[in-house]
């Protein structure tokens, strides 16, 4: 295929949040800690104030560039979990990258009209949002290399299934949008992570070719606020 110009693939959302606008504010105090080791997908041992604690990590990704021994993280006290703390962000490339995937749909809702449905069952999946004639699925992205944001950072059968469901909805006359939230501001464009999940990459480009709109937004953590920075395009690439 010829070089792709992503400008034709970016879908607008109905409620335009201004660049620099806060989309989420942590009410808890954020504390600096350091990673000792990642115990499993959702549990990390950290040091804070000279003591070791277990912290909940609400992000199933591999996060090898973010959660590794010695790296600086931000934690906050949380209730309702077996651990006292949750990891909020990790340091990379002179900035903190927000890691808590519980925030994704809260942030996404800021860009939607007031009247929307959540968690709509479609086939064997649930799509995050529906408004008017549009279905919208949200994905969080934390991996950036050489100013390119990549998703996923681990193979995702669920992500591939969502793309198939969005394509089926388009065939039925609905609009479909994939909203990608890049939780850092050092990316200039986005690509599916073909190296990590080639099957997702194939589904992604097939969906684009069939009319899926993709909207990619970048954010940064400033103090205790998550700030919307800007939209970025798909990277130009030669597909074979």
From Swiss-Prot:
CDD domains: SfsA-like. Pfam families: SfsA, SfsA_N. One of its GO terms (molecular function) is DNA binding. Belongs to the SfsA family. PANTHER family: SUGAR FERMENTATION STIMULATION PROTEIN A (PTHR30545:SF2). This is Sugar fermentation stimulation protein homolog. It comes from Saccharolobus islandicus (strain L.S.2.15 / Lassen #1). The gene is sfsA.
């Amino acid at each position: 295929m010829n070089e792709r110009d992503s400008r034709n693939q970016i879908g607008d959302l109905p409620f335009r949040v201004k660049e620099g606008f806060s989309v989420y504010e942590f009410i808890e105090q954020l504390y600096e800690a350091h990673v000792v080791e990642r115990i499993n997908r959702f549990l990390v041992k950290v040091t804070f104030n000279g003591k070791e604690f277990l912290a909940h990590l609400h992000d199933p990704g591999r996060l090898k560039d973010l959660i590794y021994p010695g790296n600086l993280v931000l934690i906050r006290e949380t209730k309702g979990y077996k651990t006292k703390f949750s990891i909020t962000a990790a340091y990379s490339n002179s900035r903190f990258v927000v890691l808590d995937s519980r925030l994704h749909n809260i942030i996404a809702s800021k860009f939607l009209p007031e009247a929307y449905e959540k968690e709509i069952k479609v086939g064997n999946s649930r799509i995050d949002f529906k408004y008017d004639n549009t279905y919208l699925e949200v994905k969080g992205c934390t991996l950036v290399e050489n100013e390119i944001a990549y998703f996923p950072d681990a193979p995702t059968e669920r992500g591939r299934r969502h793309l198939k469901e969005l394509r089926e909805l388009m065939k039925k006359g609905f609009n479909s949008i994939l909203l990608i939230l890049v939780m850092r501001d050092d990316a200039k464009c986005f690509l599916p992570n073909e190296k990590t999940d080639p099957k997702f990459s194939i589904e992604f480009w097939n969906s684009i070719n069939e009319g899926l709109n993709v909207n990619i937004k970048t954010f940064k953590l400033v103090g205790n606020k998550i700030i919307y920075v800007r939209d970025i395009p798909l990277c130009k690439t030669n597909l074979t």
